[in-house]
């Protein structure tokens, strides 16, 4: 077993600054070559403290940014122009990436498409609501206006 200090968040393992023990092969072939971790040493405690301090500062700043962006997203509806037939039925469906692109086009900032949660498949024009997880503690509800375009 190898004792490592994580420099980045690794899903299922820990966050930056955590000290973890993993199998030698996982450390040697995945974590260390990709720069996700450093080998543990006696002087590594200083590195752990600096990484954790940077993570706390970054999380605090990202929480404030997420709250500001959530207020902006909730205040204004986002218009999605999609191809649709005469009856209002869409040619395809609205996906998370479409919502993220529409938010960016509306000037409300960039959001990750993986953070968008659609209530159901959107297959016709109309008004819908979507949830966006901007931070672990911050979620915003976006009002989507799906309209027929070219």
From Swiss-Prot:
One Gene Ontology biological process: translation
GO cellular component, one term: ribonucleoprotein complex
UniProt-listed InterPro entries: Ribosomal_bL9 (IPR000244), Ribosomal_bL9/RNase_H1_N (IPR009027), Ribosomal_bL9_bac/chp (IPR020594), Ribosomal_bL9_C (IPR020069), Ribosomal_bL9_C_sf (IPR036791), Ribosomal_bL9_N (IPR020070), Ribosomal_bL9_N_sf (IPR036935)
Any single Pfam family the record assigns to this protein: Ribosomal_L9_C
Coiled coil residues, start to end: none
Keywords from the named record: Ribonucleoprotein, Ribosomal protein, RNA-binding, rRNA-binding
Domain of life: Bacteria
A GO MF term: rRNA binding
UniProt entry tagged with the keyword RNA-binding: yes
Protein family according to the UniProt entry: Belongs to the bacterial ribosomal protein bL9 family.
Role, per record: Binds to the 23S rRNA.
UniProt-recorded name of the protein: Large ribosomal subunit protein bL9
